[in-house]
């Protein structure tokens, strides 16, 4: 079992992190002489310069090539500082990756390419392996031996300790090189400065060919090279198999590092392990395997032990970790067999799904065509053909028998039709179309009866419309009778006709003679029916085949005289048949006659109708002579022939072709389904079926894959899914496991030697692995291993590290510029990358185009290509500096413009991930760069290289109103900037005053010498509040630690997932983070953000339960949730958004009751849930985490926004509450398209009275606590009035003073139908008094009545007239009770509440059930720790313990009154202390003290009318009693320029304390304002506002917002202005003059005085001119250094003193 190696790693000293930071302490072994070595700080430079004597400085100038020590420390790879026992700096050393003095390109491609010539110029011993990977160059070394009187022996000890520190910091190093400059050859002082070190620690490398040195720029001809191997300063460690006598040495190390193993397995565990050599774990489970014990020996002492074996549960590891990239630790052949089998399974599944889908499509297509009108008509035709004889005989019988025909009625005909259609059924689509509505979305479903279908079908063939209702019957009846009469007259002898007057009776008789019969006429039906049957499938098929065979002829018929196809409709369908016969196509007469009809019926041909007038057709001249004579006799009666109308049906070729093809499609399908019969068609279908069979055979043949046999095929043949792992045969296992490892701290840098020896023992294995608990820090050994990500569903409580044998070849890593020949090997590197084509193109461009701005580098290991990197030749540095805080990480003046590059693409074999920093360092060296940047665009998947870089905080340009500066650069500026067209991203404007559209990371050469250590502690942060986000931001900002397991529980996601524009907001937001800042943090990409809510806590099991029916383990739980609206929780209702979670649905299923059960008083079956009991759809809390998702504008039907904005019967929404959130929500609804008159805003009354004056701080804090629970929307009545007036003017219905009384619910659907609100009547107190009087009267009446025990005899009242009954006292009381309250009932589909604010009751019960202390708030220590050491809590739900009451005089112990971002920073410091990482931050405070919290707090919202609102106030709750009692001595400054009608303008208000410090600031306006600028005002003196108070009072400033946006004020908003003020203040405090003034001010304050203007002028006059000059010069320097953000200020050039 693999679990055998799950031992606690004994080597878990916290100092491992310090070693990674090069801040570990290495002391000399000599008791009388000890030194400390640490990584250098830039502050050390001045101290080092102080201890360098003048003669030593001259010697150093010859020995070392450096412009200044600061530049050396900043730009070189590694620098260390040497200290004595008194912590005094006694020296320093600097190391780089190329020799000092080297410049230029040696090979005309690479800079600093020393390995190109060093081996030709000097004769290195062949046994020494020197590569850039395992070697550094010493470029500076100094020890103040003269000042501190160090002996030569002590100097050597110091040098050894420095080198030991370097080797411990960089374990891969095997030696250090030093180039002794030729300029020192004749200088004895320089020689003496370093001679002892070179003689005793270094070895001089003989010169092979000094002429080669001549060609090397920067290297003196007489230069010498010295080499110091690792064993010169560090004892050689020998790795061997363990022996029993090693026990005593190893036990000492074990006991020193960990007592866990000794306590678990006994004192002689090591001896037993070594003796058996195959028992890897003792205890209850004992089994044998091939375990081995390896020992590291220095001289005759064992200093380390590694226990290894090959006993691994591979299947378990594959289930828990993402090991696919590493073949799941199998042999490649075995993994290939698994992958082949998985590919087969994947293909089989894919083919099965494709075949099933095709079968479904085929079946649905059959049903579609059968259900289609054409298919139904063809089926109908076949049915009629089968009954043709019966139908024709019946029709002939009726027509030929006058007696039957004259009695024929519509009903009888309908019965005939129904009888003829018996057995025919219309086909309807099956349920498949419901399952797959997307396949054939336009499928027809006919709802006609068979009789209706027949009649409508025959209408295509001439049956008149509305035929069954009599239309078209007895057509041409009059003409027929007249013709019959004429023929009859011709047969009789002619008589002389004499005119006589007509009589009425004769006329009536004539009309009756020509009147059509009233009985049913079957003749039109007979004609249409015969035509319908005439175009049978056989005829249609023959016709179609002839058309297909003569397609060229057909096309010509649709062309114009020039042979061009005419797209318009111009060919008459009625004549098309005759035209086709003219082309000798021999179309059958019945088809020719009915061509238009059957193409309409069976092809749905499209055409347009046109009526033209034509001459009637000529009679046939070969008529019978008698008839001709008859015509001649009646010639006198003939009228001249006139044109008659003719209907044209004009179509185009494409429409004709489409109709023929559609008819073919249906004919074939109906024949295949054996619905229609046709010999010709059957033959065609048979050929189609045969071709389909051949295609299917070819498809199956194509699917078959031929592979070469694999020896492991039999092991994987039974795999059925893609996740399973078969039993792994021994010869397929490819890993070794480290069960136990410990080593003396002094030899940790040699840990990898054990791994190399382990591979030599198990030579057939390629991987070595190790697991350890999450909380154990990474050792030096594990810093060389790759950490494997866990699978999402993994519950394994260890992390897994692996190391591949090939990584032992890291010494052979070689980086050079890419060549074209490398491109043939890049495919495996790019194959799994998302943007592989872009990387390929950019790499090719960098190789082939010399003018490209990109450079490509290839990484090789043992001649194999393992990586491709694409970087830029330069960067737009000005843009980076102006948009990001690059200065936080580098000294800009030490890194010229040419020293910067940008990483564009990376592709690296994952086995070599741990070598990323070395590769980046080599790229910088070969390009002569010192800084590398990496841009992360929005929604970019972060690459692995991101973890090696340092995140750079974004900057914001100083503004008040967010508008462009009133400033333009002069020509000189552009001349100084130069031409940026050839620079990478040169088009970016450094002064665009916009947020950068990307995030930035950076790494410098100096940073690369530090190892970024993984911290695997599982930190679960509950709540995405400002505190939680600030806490995570602080952890992520630690440069040298990579926190790999931070999980943020953010139900509904973080804010940036929902808000892109201010109008998207649905709630008020704090001013701690802007949306731009949150986006730049990229929290969703850098930590694991879970859309889940904590519902249970198991503190013993150290896990929490989520509402997604999942559990989440933790090592540290950090609760940062805020206070929420409790209105719904007080009513035991679940907010609608939360109800989508399965947890809450199951909760109601278990605890819920319907109304009937509630009214009956029936208890819940499973008891009562402590928080929730019911659910109403459409009722939301404003703090519902899914509020944004629920009210998202999706465009989907019946979504919330759709219901509120639809044109027909839109729904209404009611917002209840008095917080700023409610008004922001109203604005969000209006911005989402909800009409204002659909919005009801109901405001409850306040629960406490507003208070301004306080007797003491305690009274003020009590009042502030109430305000937290029931906050006002605005602190300024003027702002409140403006907003409410605007809302009411737009039609929003506002109801003030009402409380939520009842929610009307549809009991079946649980949908909100309406809301009832209630408030006390105006005469409420009077009514109460009247009720009491009436009750007293009832008591008196009952006491005086003889029948008091019976009460009022209501039977008498019911017997009499109700209208005349007297009103009883009880009825009067009922009437008074009804009048106590005024109710309003609002019909509303949605209700959003924002009532009293308090702790989430679910969180409260979690706290209560786990025994955490709660007293109105969760009680925490000053380090935010609860009673559980691994549970921290911070934010609005917390309160410091009462033990700190004496420390919080005048300050609130509750944290809801402090800035959340500041709290998060303090919380991060405390957690780092718990992890023993507190040294990584500058914050310092003890557990016995409360943290200092001073940052202002603020809130903002986007309000109706597109108004931006912000209110920020000082965090100042501790004021002296005299201050509390004193009246304000300064008026508020209020500037109101808002036009109420047009809603344009600004409103700003400054409130000052009695010392002239800005206490509060309020802004309201249509123009966005910089939040940081508003925040910067708070705590600022009124004197910084350019005499604003005086100018405004005198009317000189009409608009303060405009005034504060002028150029003079921009410096106030600079992000570093507050830091500048602080530094200036600290410098001033050093002055005695300032101290005297402060003492005077303190006495004045003790007497009750304030900094009134008179007193300020008085003390201002006492400030010395030197201090004023110092302040002025400091201000100029500040502006001069920040010209990229303050270009509008003119600063005179700085004077340079020249000695």
Swiss-Prot record:
Biological process according to GO: cilium movement; cilium organization
Gene3D superfamilies assigned to the protein according to its UniProt record, in alphabetical order: 3.50.50.100
Bias-annotated ranges (Polar residues): 1-22
Coiled coil listed as a keyword: yes
Region listing for Disordered, in residue ranges: 1-23, 489-515, 1340-1365
Single GO cellular component term: 9+2 motile cilium
Pfam family, one: CFAP61_dimer
Compositional bias (Basic residues): 489-503
Subcellular location per the Swiss-Prot or TrEMBL entry: Cell projection, Cilium
Keyword Coiled coil: yes
Gene null: resulting phenotype: Knockout cells show deficiencies in cell multiplication and ciliary functions. Mutants move with greatly reduced velocities, have disturbed waveform of beating cilia and have stiffer cilia. Mutant cilia lack an adjacent portion of the radial spoke 3 stem region.
Keywords recorded for this protein, A-Z: Cell projection, Coiled coil
UniProt feature, compositional bias: Basic and acidic residues: 504-515, 1340-1359
Function: As component of a spoke-associated complex, regulates ciliary mobility by mediating a stable and functional assembly of the radial spoke 3 (RS3).
Name listed for the protein in its UniProt record: Cilia- and flagella-associated protein 61
Organism: Tetrahymena thermophila (strain SB210)
């Amino acid at each position: 079992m693999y679990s055998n190696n799950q031992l606690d790693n004994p080597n878990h000293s916290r100092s491992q992190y310090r070693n990674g930071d090069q801040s570990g302490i290495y002391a000399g072994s000599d008791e009388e002489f000890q030194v400390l070595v640490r990584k250098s700080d830039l502050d050390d430079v001045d101290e080092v310069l102080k201890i360098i004597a003048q003669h030593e400085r001259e010697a150093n100038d010859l020995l070392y090539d450096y412009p200044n020590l600061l530049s050396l420390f900043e730009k070189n790879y590694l620098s260390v500082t040497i200290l004595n026992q008194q912590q005094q700096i006694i020296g320093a050393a600097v190391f780089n990756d190329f020799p000092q003095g080297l410049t230029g390109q040696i090979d005309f491609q690479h800079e600093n390419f020393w390995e190109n010539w060093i081996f030709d110029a000097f004769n290195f011993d062949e046994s020494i392996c020197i590569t850039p990977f395992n070697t550094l160059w010493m470029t500076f070394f100094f020890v103040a031996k003269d000042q501190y009187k160090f002996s030569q022996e002590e100097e050597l000890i110091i040098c050894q300790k420095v080198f030991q520190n370097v080797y411990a910091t960089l374990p891969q190093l095997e030696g250090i090189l030093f180039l002794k400059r030729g300029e020192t050859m004749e200088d004895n002082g320089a020689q003496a400065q370093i001679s002892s070190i070179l003689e005793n620690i270094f070895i001089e490398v003989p010169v092979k060919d000094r002429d080669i040195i001549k060609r090397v720029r920067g290297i003196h001809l007489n230069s010498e090279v010295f080499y110091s191997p690792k064993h010169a300063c560090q004892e050689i460690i020998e790795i061997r198999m363990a022996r029993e006598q090693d026990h005593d040495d190893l036990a000492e190390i074990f006991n020193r590092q960990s007592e866990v193993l000794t306590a678990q397995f006994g004192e002689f565990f090591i001896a037993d392990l070594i003796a058996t050599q195959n028992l890897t774990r003792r205890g209850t489970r004992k089994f044998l395997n091939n375990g081995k014990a390896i020992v590291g020996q220095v001289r005759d002492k064992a200093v380390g032990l590694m226990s290894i074996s090959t006993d691994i549960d591979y299947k378990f590891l594959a289930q828990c970790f993402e090991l696919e990239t590493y073949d799941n630790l199998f042999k490649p052949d075995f993994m290939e067999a698994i992958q082949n089998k998985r590919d087969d399974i994947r293909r089989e599944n894919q083919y099965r799904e494709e075949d099933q889908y095709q079968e479904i499509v085929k079946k649905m297509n059959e049903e579609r065509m059968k259900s289609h009108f054409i298919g139904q008509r063809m089926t109908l035709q076949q049915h009629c053909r089968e009954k043709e004889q019966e139908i024709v005989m019946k029709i002939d019988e009726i027509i030929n028998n006058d007696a039957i025909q004259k009695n024929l009625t519509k009903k009888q005909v309908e019965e005939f039709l129904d009888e003829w259609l018996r057995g025919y059924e219309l086909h309807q689509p099956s349920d498949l179309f419901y399952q797959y509505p997307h396949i054939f979305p336009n499928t027809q479903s006919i709802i006609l009866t068979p009789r209706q279908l027949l009649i409508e079908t025959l209408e295509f063939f001439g049956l008149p419309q509305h035929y069954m209702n009599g239309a078209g019957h007895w057509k041409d009846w009059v003409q027929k009778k007249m013709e019959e009469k004429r023929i009859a007259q011709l047969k009789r002898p002619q008589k002389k006709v004499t005119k006589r007057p007509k009589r009425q009776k004769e006329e009536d008789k004539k009309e009756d003679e020509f009147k059509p019969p009233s009985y049913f006429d079957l003749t039109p039906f007979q004609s249409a029916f015969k035509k319908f049957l005439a175009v049978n499938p056989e005829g249609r098929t023959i016709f179609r085949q002839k058309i297909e065979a003569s397609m060229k002829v057909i096309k010509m018929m649709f062309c114009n005289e020039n042979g061009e196809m005419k797209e318009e409709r111009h060919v008459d369908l009625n004549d098309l048949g005759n035209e086709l016969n003219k082309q000798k196509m021999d179309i059958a007469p019945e088809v020719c006659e009915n061509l238009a009809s059957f193409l309409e019926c069976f092809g749905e041909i499209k055409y347009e109708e046109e009526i033209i007038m034509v001459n009637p057709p000529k009679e046939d001249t070969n008529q019978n002579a008698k008839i001709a004579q008859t015509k001649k006799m009646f010639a006198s009666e003939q009228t001249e022939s006139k044109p008659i109308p003719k209907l044209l049906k004009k179509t185009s070729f494409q429409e004709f072709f489409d109709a023929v093809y559609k008819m073919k499609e249906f004919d074939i399908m109906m024949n295949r389904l054996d619905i229609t019969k046709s010999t010709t068609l059957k033959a065609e279908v048979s050929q189609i079926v045969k071709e389909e069979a051949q295609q299917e055979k070819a498809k199956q043949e194509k699917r078959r894959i031929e592979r070469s046999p694999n020896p492991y095929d039999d092991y994987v043949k039974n795999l059925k899914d893609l996740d399973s792992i078969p039993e792994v045969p021994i010869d397929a296992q490819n890993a070794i496991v480290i069960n136990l490892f410990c080593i003396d701290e002094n030899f940790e840098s040699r840990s990898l030697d054990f791994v190399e020896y382990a591979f030599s023992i198990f030579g057939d294995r390629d991987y070595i692995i190790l697991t350890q608990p999450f909380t154990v820090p990474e050792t030096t050994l594990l810093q060389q291993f790759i950490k494997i990500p866990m699978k999402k569903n993994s519950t394994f409580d260890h992390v897994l590290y692996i190391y591949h044998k090939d990584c032992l070849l890291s010494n052979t890593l070689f980086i050079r510029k890419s060549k074209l020949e490398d491109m043939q090997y890049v495919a495996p590197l790019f194959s799994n990358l998302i943007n592989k084509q872009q990387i390929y193109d950019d790499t090719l461009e960098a190789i082939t185009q010399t003018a490209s701005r990109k450079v490509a580098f290839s990484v090789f290991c043992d001649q194999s290509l393992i990586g491709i990197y694409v970087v830029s030749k330069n960067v737009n540095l000005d843009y980076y500096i102006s948009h990001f805080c690059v200065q936080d990480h580098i000294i800009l003046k030490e890194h010229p413009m040419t020293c910067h590059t940008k990483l564009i693409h990376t592709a690296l074999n994952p086995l070599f991930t741990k070598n990323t920093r070395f590769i980046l360092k080599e790229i910088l060296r070969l390009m002569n760069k010192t800084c590398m940047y990496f841009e992360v665009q929005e929604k970019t998947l972060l690459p692995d290289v991101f973890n090696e870089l340092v995140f750079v905080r974004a900057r914001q340009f100083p503004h008040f109103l967010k508008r462009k500066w009133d400033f333009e650069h002069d020509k000189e500026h552009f001349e100084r900037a130069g031409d940026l067209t050839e620079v990478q991203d040169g088009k970016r404007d450094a002064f665009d005053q916009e947020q950068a559209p990307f995030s930035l990371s950076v790494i410098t050469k100096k940073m690369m010498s530090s190892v970024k250590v993984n911290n695997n502690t599982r930190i679960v942060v509950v709540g995405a509040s400002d505190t939680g986000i600030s806490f995570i931001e602080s952890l992520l900002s630690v440069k040298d630690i990579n926190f790999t397991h931070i999980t943020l529980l953010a139900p509904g996601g973080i804010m940036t997932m929902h808000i892109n524009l201010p109008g998207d907001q649905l709630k008020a937001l704090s001013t701690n983070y802007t949306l731009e800042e949150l986006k730049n943090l990229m929290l969703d990409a850098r930590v694991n953000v879970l859309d889940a809510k904590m519902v249970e806590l198991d503190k013993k099991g150290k896990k929490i339960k989520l509402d997604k029916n999942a559990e989440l383990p933790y090592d540290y739980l950090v609760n940062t949730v805020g206070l929420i609206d409790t209105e719904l929780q007080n009513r035991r209702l679940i907010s609608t958004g939360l109800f989508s979670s399965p947890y809450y649905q199951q909760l109601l299923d278990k605890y819920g009751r319907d109304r009937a059960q509630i009214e009956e008083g029936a208890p819940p079956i499973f008891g009562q849930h402590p928080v929730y009991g019911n659910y109403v759809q459409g009722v939301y809390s404003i703090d519902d985490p899914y509020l944004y998702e629920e009210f998202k504008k999706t465009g989907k039907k019946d979504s919330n926004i759709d219901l509120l904005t639809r044109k027909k019967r839109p729904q209404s929404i009611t917002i209840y509450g008095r917080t700023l959130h409610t008004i922001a929500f109203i604005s969000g609804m209006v911005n989402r398209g909800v009409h204002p008159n659909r919005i009801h805003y109901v405001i409850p009354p306040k629960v406490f009275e507003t208070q301004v004056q306080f007797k003491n701080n305690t009274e003020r804090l009590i009042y502030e606590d109430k305000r937290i629970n029931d906050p006002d929307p605005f602190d300024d009545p003027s702002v409140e009035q403006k907003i409410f007036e605007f809302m009411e003017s737009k039609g929003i219905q506002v109801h003030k003073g009402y409380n939520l009384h009842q929610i009307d619910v549809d009991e079946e659907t649980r949908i909100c139908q309406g809301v009832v609100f209630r408030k006390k009547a105006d005469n409420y107190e009077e009514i109460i008094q009247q009720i009491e009087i009436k009750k007293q009267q009832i008591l008196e009446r009952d006491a005086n009545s003889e029948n008091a025990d019976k009460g009022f005899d209501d039977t008498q009242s019911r017997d009499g007239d109700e209208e005349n009954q007297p009103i009883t006292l009880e009825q009067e009381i009922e009437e008074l009770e009804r009048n106590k309250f005024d109710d309003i009932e609002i019909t509303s589909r949605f209700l959003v509440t924002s009532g009293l604010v308090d702790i989430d009751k679910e969180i409260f019960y979690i706290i209560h059930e786990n025994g955490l202390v709660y007293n109105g708030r969760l009680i925490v220590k000053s380090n935010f720790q609860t009673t559980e050491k691994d549970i921290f809590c911070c934010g609005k739900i917390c309160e410091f313990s009462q033990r700190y009451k004496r420390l919080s005089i005048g300050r609130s112990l509750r944290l809801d009154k402090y800035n959340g971002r500041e709290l998060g920073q303090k919380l991060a410091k405390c957690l780092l202390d718990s992890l023993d990482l507190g040294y990584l931050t500058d914050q310092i405070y003890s557990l016995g003290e409360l943290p200092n919290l001073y940052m202002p707090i603020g809130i903002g919202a986007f309000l109706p009318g597109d108004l931006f609102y912000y209110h920020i106030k000082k965090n100042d709750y501790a004021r002296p009693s005299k201050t509390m009692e004193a009246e304000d001595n300064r008026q508020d400054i209020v500037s109101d320029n808002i036009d109420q009608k047009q809603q344009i303008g600004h409103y700003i208000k400054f409130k000052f304390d009695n010392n002239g410090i800005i206490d509060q600031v309020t802004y309201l306006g249509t123009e966005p304002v910089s939040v940081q600028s508003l925040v910067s005002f708070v705590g600022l003196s009124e004197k910084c506002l350019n005499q604003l108070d005086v100018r405004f009072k005198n009317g000189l400033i009409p608009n303060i917002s405009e005034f504060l946006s002028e150029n003079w004020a921009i410096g106030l908003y600079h992000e570093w202005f507050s830091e500048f003020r602080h530094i200036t203040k600290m410098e001033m405090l050093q002055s005695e003059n300032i101290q005297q003034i402060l003492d005077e001010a303190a006495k004045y304050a003790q007497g009750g005085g304030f900094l009134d203007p008179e007193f300020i002028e008085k003390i201002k006059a006492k400030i010395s001119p030197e201090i004023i000059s110092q302040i002025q010069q400091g201000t100029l320097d500040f502006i001069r250094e920040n010209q990229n953000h303050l270009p509008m200020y003119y600063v005179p050039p700085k004077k340079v003193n020249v000695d």
